[in-house]
Every structure is written in structure tokens, then in C-alpha cells.
């Protein structure tokens, strides 16, 4: 698969043809780029014209990205519909308050509170999308300005914990894609943080460094995409567009593929070789009889052992830093010509490899290691002593670089003369491989990434989502953006020992990071092997180093909240920094996502629980300072408070139970016709708004529909669990939401690829949604039985019909959940429909039978009429809140 040629209609002022970069929201070659697209129009043309009319002044630096806004043809109706719907919701709430139901005031007040809450959350969600902006980087201008030696350094952080739950092959592919990316080898460094201190990861990284000596020059020579070998060899071959002859390319490709298969075999063998090596060693035991896990040279591994022992188990082990690949030097180094022992010709290829470092921070009992945030902060300090690049990229271990131009694209925003200095981070969307074709559990989450984040891009910038993000190092250190920084503030003022710890070598790197905007510093290149230097590196990742400092609070990634990503981005925005959103075609990065229902729900539980932790902490968006823009504050309030909707959603979904215990009394807002008219209007308008949003965001109806369905799935179970957990945490002092590593599975053949989709892992998280489904199925069956028995008045028929529509709609929204708990039977969706029909029929038959028995002896009790009011007071806005 060769590097894709530039799209014919790629966006850009200079008709540049940088391979791999096209309009963020349009397929390559689709419609002449963003500037000519009918939904997006340039927003910075006047600024560019003014810059061209310099009036004899020195020419201003060129703009490194273009800004586009939604055309007024779509944007004005979108805003108007939002305003009209807001007015309709206000009028509806006022009408409901005026027409009170005195027969069931307690339930009426609950429904009023629910409708008000849903109206507020819808407004919070919608307000941040009223000014969507997309920005398209110009790579050709970046190359002309900085490829002569001015490109800044980039440190890349990769995080992993378990080589089984997070397959090591994914992690090593991520590293290979980073080493091979289209960026000068002497200007970027890769750091693997192994929070499990596994010898398998360490030796796997050794194998990866060896294979990289072949893979990286091959990628540079033939300009292949993507540069993660697993994805590259799995993709369908595209026409070759590299500089070599096709025959040479295909010969090289066969050799590299064979070497890659051997590399994978060596990785797999580590899981048997390491235990066998340790078992075979004579006298291999510590004083307590535990067998040590041995490295290849026979010495005990300082990290975790296969047989846990004191100081060698999870949560208790020494810190480890190993430099796998040292600094390559600044001058290109050409490879060897083809020979009998080296069949690939690299004589015209720069074969240098970037710095590669293995890190396992120290862990000891009695210390809270702060999970991913703690690991990232340790990487931040270690990298400062070894490479100290001014910019940092972070990846999860299951993500890889899919577009080798991604680093350059992010720098277009960081180095632009308009807002570059005030930009703290550039966020890329998350895209995933091996998600089922219908995206049953909304893993792609396109409504959030392609609509909500584009909306925030027009305010202060998108939120940080945990991976695929470039940071400015000094912003993470807690510095203020230049526009908020006093003129007499020197970068050296950042280096306060009480704030950053007692390592003076580390503190001395902070001013250097603040001042190096265009060149990489490699202070450790000549001293990586010196004992004192490495001792200092080990010191900054000890457990006690952060005691009495601001790490995890005002410095680095934020601690004590499960969603450390969102709260860290919020801290930067609160200080006045901006962020930028960058989507590319082809996608900049791709990763894996949980396609099993239970794993996906646990992932959502961590997100929703962490959001509530943030809302009820001192990082609450409502308490932020004046530097946070009002609309950005609104967006963060929406991101952190949305799980509360579950309280009202569950009440609405369980109304049939309420009426079963309420003697069959039927209450609905009167006058009925006016109520239904309002209800239809407010729901219909949100559907129309959604259709307009689909147009400008480049979504599909399936994307939008899956978002609606999974919001209901989350609200009936996971969000409720998050709310209850936070309540218990406040009342009983429980710990925060427990971090559960989302297990990933290696993709197998066609039969195994989606095997996890059909596995049922029963968990308490499934129970609430199962109950909601059962209640609504029972309501439908009981209503059918009541219809057979007869005895309804016309008014009751109208009310029951409205209730049945609601019951059916709840089941339609929970359809993906129902498939998930059916396991392998979900391969035949018709079985689900047959099961639901049979369940409703069974309930109806039971209702009729009980009614007949009781009617034969005496009058039927009042509770048999409960089904007529199964959903008596319908929620007016029960599905107005989008996103999760």
C-alpha cells in the first residue's frame, strides 16, 4: 500500500500537494476542498489580503492554517431553529406550570423538574455548537518555513499497563509508527511508560528497536502509509506512488513482510521464553523462596516478577529507565547498498532512528500512584532530563499513527503567528479499527468528535480527550499564556523548587523548554550513560518526589479524578490557554475500541463518574475564573453534569411500575390535545436541528441514530450507577470511580474479528437496563390484554395510545442493548423481534386469564386497569440531551 497522492481538490491557498492531508471533513478529492465546499466558506480571506498589503513594511509570516465557517445557508437556519425550539420549550414549561394536576401532584412535580432539567441540558449542549469552526493546516508552508532546520522537538508519550489486556503487538505497532513518522529523526523522541513494569514489555521493546532498523528505512524509501506494519500489511494494496521502481518496491515489501512475521513470532514467544528461562535457572530464588524473573543476561528483573515477591509485584517495585535508542545526531546517515547479506538497498535513505526510552516508575505501598495521570507526569519529568522537547504528543498503547503528516499538521497550529503562542494543545479526533460495521455501541462517537468539538473549536477550543493530542510543555508546567502573562514575567520564574520538586537539573530544564520555540535540545545526548545523570532521572520518578509539590494540581496532569484528561484540559482553558481541533484525511491516528457491551459500559461508567467527580470538585466549571470564556464554561458544565439526567430518565422509563402501584389511576396533562401538540413540536424540532447538524458536520443518519440509542442505554444504567457512586462517596467518604482497564482483543480472522461483540459478560451494570426493558415490555402486553378485555373510554384509549408509543420508543432505543445481552443469538435480529412479540403476547394472555378468573367470582380489582395509564405523564423532553 503506497502513500496516497494528494487530493486533487485539497484545501489550501497554494494548491499544495502534501500527501496524506486533505479537508478534515470531506473525502479526499471531494468537491475542491473546504474553500469551495457548499457547507463551509473561508473565514480569513480579509486577513490574508490585509497581510499582503504590507505598505512597505517587512512581510508578515504566512498563515499556517486556514479557517472555515459553516455557510450562512445552513448556519442561520440552524441558529434560528435553536432559538425557536428554546422559545417552544419555555412556553411549554409555562403552560404546564399553569395547568397543574392536583390528583397526582408529587408525580407532576417530578415530571416538571425532569422537563426543566432536560431543557437546560439540551440548551447547554446546543449552545456550544452555534459557531462551528474548522481549521485546515497548510503543510507546504510549514515545510518552506521550517524544514531547513527550524522544526521544534517533539517528545511522544505512549502509555500501557498490561501486555495481555492491552496486547503487546498493538503497543509495539504504535511505537513503530512513531519511529517511522515523517519527521526528522533527531527532532523527536519516544517514551514508553510501562505502568506494570513487565519484562515482556521491556524485551518486546528491544525486539521492536531491532525491527525498526529495517521498518523505518523501508517506510522512508517507499513513503508507505500507514506506518504501523500490522495495519499496513492488513490493508488492501493501493497503486504504488513511491520514487522507486514497482519491481523493487514489491521485492522489498515481501522481504519486510517476512521479517515482520518473524518479529511477531518473537513477541509471542516472550510469554513462554521468560517463564521457561526463569524456571530453568539453578538457584534462582530470593531469600523467601520466590523465583525471580530473569532478564536475557541472567540478572533478576527489577520490575514485577511472574511469581510476585516483595519489591517485585504490582504496586511495589523499583523504578526503571532504559535508553533503547540514543540520540541519532543531526547529520543524515545513509544506509547500506543492497548485498547478499543485506538485500534491501538503503544507500539513498536516512537510516537514523529517534530516541527510544523505556520507563517504569517506582511504586510503593502507601502511595497513591494516580494511574495514568501519575504515569504521564513521571514521563514529563524524565523526558525533560533526556530530550526536553517543547512539544509533547501522547498516545494510548492501542493507538498508532495512521497519517505520517500528523506531527507537522499539529505544528501548523502551534507555530502560527495568530494564536500559536496562546495554544496549549491540539486535539485530533479518535478513530477506530475493528469496530463492527453498524457501530452497535457508538464507539466512533461521531456526533461528539465531528459536531461538538467543531463547535468548541469556534470558542476557546476542544476539550482534551486523553489520546492523540499535542501539548505545549510549558503549559503543562502551569505557565500562563503570553497574552495573560505580565510583561516583566521571565520564564525562569517557572523554576520554583517548592512547586516542581527538589531536582535542580529538572528545574533548570523548565526555562529552556519555555524559550526553545524552534529547535530541539538534546542536553543528555553526551551523558546518557553517566551514572549521575541516570540517577537524577531515576530520582524524578520515585514515589516520594511529588510530596509537597504542585504535581497533579497546578502542574502536569490532574490527579484524583477518573477523567484526568477532561480536567487537565479544563485547567489549561481556565488559565486562559486556547486549544485547536485538527481532523485529517486520511485519519491522523487510529486505535482499538471495546466492542463488547459490558466492556463498553465500564468505559462509559469511568467517563460519567469522572465527569461528576469533576463537577462536585473545586474544578467545577461554574467556579472557574474570568479567563474561561462564557460559552466554554457552558460546554464544560454540560460535559460534567450530564449523568444527572439519569435520575429523571429512569423515573420516566419506569412509569408503568408507578401506575401499577397507584391503583390504576390514570393521570395525564390536560387538556390532552394541547399537551400532545406541544410534545410533538418540541421533539420534532430537535429532529430537524439534528438533520441540519448532520449536514455541516459530515455525519450520517446512522451516526446520529447510534448516538441517540447509546445515550438511552447509558442513562438507564451506567449514568445512574455513576450518580449513586458520587452520592455514596460524598456521604460515606468512598474513593472515586475505580479505574478499570478496558481490555482489547487482537483481531483474528473473519470468524474471530467480532467475537467479542457476541460474548455476554454479565455484570450488575446490565441489571437496571434489563429492568427498564422488562417493565416496558410488560406495559405493552398488559395494554394489549386490556384492549382484549375492553372497557376503555375514548379518552382512556387516547392516553393509552400515547403511552404505548412511548413504551415502543424506549424499546427501539434500547435495541442495541437487547442484541448485546442475547449473545450469539443477536446474529439473527429476527429472533429478538420474535422474543419481544412472544413476551408481550404472554403478558397479554396472562392479563386476560387473570381478569377472567377474577371476573367470574367478583369485580376485577382496580390494579388490572394499570396498563391503560402505563406512561401517564409523558416526558416532554426525555430525549433532548445528546452525547455522553
UniProtKB/Swiss-Prot annotation:
Designated name of the protein: Probable mixed-linked glucan synthase 9
Top-tier EC class: transferase
Pfam families referenced in this protein's UniProt entry, alphabetically: Cellulose_synt
InterPro entries for the chain: Cellulose_synth, Nucleotide-diphossugar_trans
UniProt keyword annotation of Nucleotide-binding present: no
Record family assignment: Belongs to the glycosyltransferase 2 family. Plant cellulose synthase-like F subfamily.
Keywords: Cell wall biogenesis/degradation, Glycosyltransferase, Golgi apparatus, Membrane, Transferase, Transmembrane, Transmembrane helix
Bilayer topology term: Multi-pass membrane protein
Taxonomic classification: Eukaryota, Viridiplantae, Streptophyta, Embryophyta, Tracheophyta
Location of the active site: 195, 565
Keyword Acetylation included in the entry's annotation: no
Region Disordered: start-end pairs: 1-34
Function: May catalyze both beta-1,3 and beta-1,4 glycosidic linkage on beta-D-glucan. Essential for (1,3;1,4)-beta-D-glucans synthesis in grasses and cereals (Poaceae). The mixed-linked glucans (which are not present in walls of dicotyledons or most other monocotyledonous plants) are particularly important constituents of the walls of the starchy endosperm and aleurone cells of cereal grains such as oats, wheat, rice and barley. They can account for up to 70% by weight of the wall.
Enzyme Commission number: 2.4.1.-
Primary location recorded for the protein, binned into one broad class: Golgi
GO BP: any one term: plant-type primary cell wall biogenesis
Binding site for substrate: 396, 398
Transmembrane segments: 73-93, 104-124, 640-660, 672-692, 708-728, 765-785, 802-822, 830-850
Cell compartments where the protein resides: Golgi apparatus membrane
GO cellular component: Golgi membrane; plasma membrane
Segments of skewed composition (Low complexity): 1-27
Organism, as annotated: Oryza sativa subsp. japonica (Rice)
Gene Ontology MF terms in the entry: cellulose synthase (UDP-forming) activity
